[in-house]
Amino acid sequence: TATTSGGKVELGPEPFPDGGQIALIRDPLGAGFTVYQGNSPAGVTEGVGGRRGHALFVSDAHAVMPFYQALFGWQCGQDNNGTRAILQGGGTIAHLHEVPDPALRGTEEYWAVIFSATPNTSTRLTGSGGHVLASAALPEGAAKMATDPDGAMFFFTENAS
C-alpha cells in the first residue's frame, strides 16, 4: 500500500459518482497524484486538447522509484528514444525528470500533464488570464510550462495541428 511504501494518503478512498473510488496520494518526496478504481472514464481524448503524456519531476529518482514499483509494479528504465522513463509491461507510463536544483524544479516535487495544443495556444492562454512560465524541451516535444487563471500548473505542446 501507499503508506507502507513511504507515501501518504491525503484523501480517500472516496466514492466517485460513477460507482468507482478515488484517492489522493503523495509519494515519499511529496509529489501528489490521484488514483481511480472503476470503469474507464468517458471523454478521454487524444489529439489537440487531449493528453499527450505525463511526467514526474523529482529531486531524487532513486528515492521514489521503489514506492512506485511497490504500489503499481512500475520500473525505471528508458523509452524507445533512450529517455529516462517509468515503464510497465514494456510501455512508457510517464517520463521521469530528475531535477535536484529547486531553482529549476521549483520548491515541490510534482507530476505534470502534457497536453497537445494548436500553435496559437500561448496567445489564447494569456488572453484568458493564464500565464506561460517557461519553455522546456521534453520527450513529448518543445513544451511550455503554464498556469491557468487559478494557478494550476500544466505543460502543453503547440505543434499539434
Model-identified regions with their sequence ranges:
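Vicinal oxygen chelate
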Residues: 3-50, 55-56, 78-102, 122-161
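Amphipathic alpha-helical segments
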Residues: 1-4, 60-75, 121-127
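Eukaryotic phosphotyrosine signaling hubs
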Residues: 110-111
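Hydrophobic pocket-lining residues within nucleotide cofactor-binding pockets
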Residues: 16, 61, 117
